[in-house]
Design a protein with these regions (language model features):
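Basic, nucleic-acid-binding surfaces and adjacent catalytic neighborhoods in DNA/RNA-processing proteins
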Residues: 22-40, 53, 58, 65, ...
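Phosphate/anion-contacting hairpin/loop surfaces
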Residues: 68-184, 189-192, 196, 201
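Acidic, proline/glycine-enriched N-terminal capping motif
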Residues: 1-129, 267-275, 281-303
Length: 303
């Protein structure tokens, strides 16, 4: 799912192309896309884009003199945006919608069969606020506010960082990178953290989000960002299961749950202890290895 750095770079690219431009036509190809339409989506046609804003992991396009209509795009896991010259064809099932401007078309696609991307059309700031999960913008916060939100409930760090009601714009990929940078376990409990660990985590959130935003900006340059993915070669742990840690050379490990996977370094983050992978621990039960060395030995024995 595109997260804060990806969304910021999308908005950068959109500002260059549609800010101040009139939206001529909206073409919706998927019956699953439009979730709310008060006012109707057709009311956005003919209006000028006057604002672009990020709301968590959503892209908000404000139209009309006082931003009286907002188009709120939530890409979810597999949704992506593309810029095409002229009237681009929008073909289901992959094509979801097209937004036509004089200078080109913003095309919205979604891979896979699960159509989870959503478009909300709302009126004014009140309508926009109703869609805000309320998470803290860490890049606009100080340490005290961050600590208060983090410890407001006793969650694991992984859950807390990815809860949009607590923190804005952070998902599965960048939470892995943040926790590696902070050298903290994804299973550490928020109310058990020491002050220096909270300070380290705050610094890691800011550093990771800022560094990746700037990196993606450089990669995109003046082009529209087309290589939006949760798995990037420069990442330290996310998507790097069994690859060597860049700090200690231990093999990156994973925790799988539902459709998600958390990656971490057992040496840098969990003091050499392996965290139980739900799928494997059910299979191995009491034989679940406790250290990377035990895992390596078990792997050899089962070959």
């Amino acid at each position: 799912m595109p997260e804060l750095p990806d969304i910021v770079v999308y908005i950068d690219a959109l500002r260059k192309r549609i800010l101040g431009e009139r939206l001529d036509r909206v073409r919706i190809a998927s019956p699953f896309l439009l979730r709310t339409a008060t006012p109707p989506v057709g009311d956005a046609e003919g209006k000028t884009v006057v604002q672009l804003r990020r709301l968590g992991k959503r892209i908000c396009i404000g139209l009309g003199g006082d931003s009286d209509i907002w188009l709120v795009l939530h890409l979810m896991i597999a949704g992506r945006l593309h810029w095409r010259k002229g009237d681009a064809k929008v073909s289901p099932p992959r094509g979801l919608a097209a937004f036509d401007f004089a200078g080109g078309t913003l095309l919205w696609t979604e891979a896979g069969s699960q159509k989870r991307a959503s478009l909300h059309v709302v009126a004014g700031e009140d309508g926009l606020s109703a869609l805000d999960p309320g998470g803290l913008e860490v890049l606009e916060s100080d340490l005290g506010r961050f600590a208060a939100v983090l410890t407001s409930a006793n969650h694991t760090l992984k859950r807390a960082l990815t809860d949009p009601r607590l923190f804005s714009g952070i998902g599965n990929a960048y939470s892995d990178e943040i926790l590696f940078e902070a050298q903290l376990s994804p299973f550490a409990l928020t109310q058990k953290l020491k002050p220096d660990q909270i300070e380290r985590l705050f610094a890691a959130v800011r550093a990771s989000l800022l560094q990746w935003t700037e990196r993606l900006r450089r990669e995109a340059g003046n082009d529209f960002p087309e290589k939006v993915t949760a798995f990037r070669p420069g990442m330290a742990v996310h998507g790097r299961y069994k690859e060597p840690c860049r700090r200690c050379q231990a093999k990156i490990q994973r925790i799988r749950y539902a459709a998600n996977e958390t990656n971490y370094c057992p040496i840098c983050q969990t003091a050499g202890r392996l965290l139980a992978d739900r799928a494997l621990s059910r299979l191995l039960r009491e034989d679940w290895p406790r250290t990377p060395e035990e895992l390596e030995l078990l792997t050899r024995e089962r070959r």
